[in-house]
Amino acid sequence: MTTKIALLSDIHGNSPALQAVLNDMQNQECTQVFMLGDIINGVDPHGCIQLLHDWCETNHAELTCLKGNGEEYLLTPDRDQLPDQDKEWNVDIINLVQWWEDHLTHADIEWIQTFHNHLFWKDACLVHDSPIDRLMSESWHKPNIAPQYQEWFYHSRGILPDMQDEEWEKLWAFMDTQNFSLVFCGHTHIPFFREHAGKRIYNLGSAGAPLDGDPRPAWVLVTESPSTDLDIAIRRVEYDIRLIHDLIDQTPDYYDFKDPDFKEAYKNWLSTGVHWKAHLGH
């Protein structure tokens, strides 16, 4: 019996893009879904959660989720006690996370609390950013920061296609010591595949906000059959970008849009697959 599994990451509140990915998943008859985090950090956090739930229920698909940065921030306790409360960058993140929380239901937040930090599935390690960051978190913990605030003050580089050779060697060696031969990750919004000595890494890219110069949402299809190894393919889907632009225009209170230039840069990011910083006029 052949089983189709969908893996996706980094929706970033872009419900029109997510709907296009879900339509493609339905066409492929996926019956299991792994979501690797960053669902909520965008203009339609509740809408994206609702779409995922409804699609999986309608298609009788099992859904398993990991926390991304957005979910980690949301679940940070006692945010009013965070260090560096008065620093501008922190004020902005605190207010942005509060906006997400205000636009989620109690049931949404309870569900997010069930998300995993990382997951092992068959011969694979599933993470949001990097298996080293998830399985060796003590390596990046900052001194004088309370344990509950460590994730708030850490933003992984993730796994990028242009990493230096020594970074790749460290990652392959880590996979050897941990006895897994396959990694699925997200975080960088750049979909790609890398193989070395029987080990494979798939970055799922982003299902809502790509950063590889291609605005089409990305996801990964895994086909499992008894007679062959896992068949793994990165897929891209078309969607009407005007729909997310309209949603942005209908959400003027989104905290990041306090700067009108950022709002336009954000739209241009989603239209081009090029980071919003490249579109700012200042």
Language model segments and positions:
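Active-site environment of divalent metal-dependent phosphoester hydrolases
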Residues: 12-17, 41-44, 70-75, 119-120, ...
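Acidic, His/Gly-rich catalytic cores of divalent-metal-dependent hydrolytic chemistry
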Residues: 182, 194-282
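Internal, conserved structured core segments that host functional sites
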Residues: 110-160
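A contiguous binding-surface segment within folded domains or other stable secondary-structure elements
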Residues: 156-211
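Active-site neighborhood of phospho(di)ester-bond hydrolases with catalytic His/Asp-centered motifs
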Residues: 8-9, 33-38, 64-69, 127, ...
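N-terminal active-site segment of His-dependent metallophosphoesterases
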Residues: 1-55
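Active-site neighborhood of divalent metal-dependent phosphoester bond hydrolases
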Residues: 54-121, 158-174, 179
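Beta-strand-turn-beta hairpins that frame and shape the catalytic cleft
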Residues: 1-6, 119-125, 196-200, 230-231
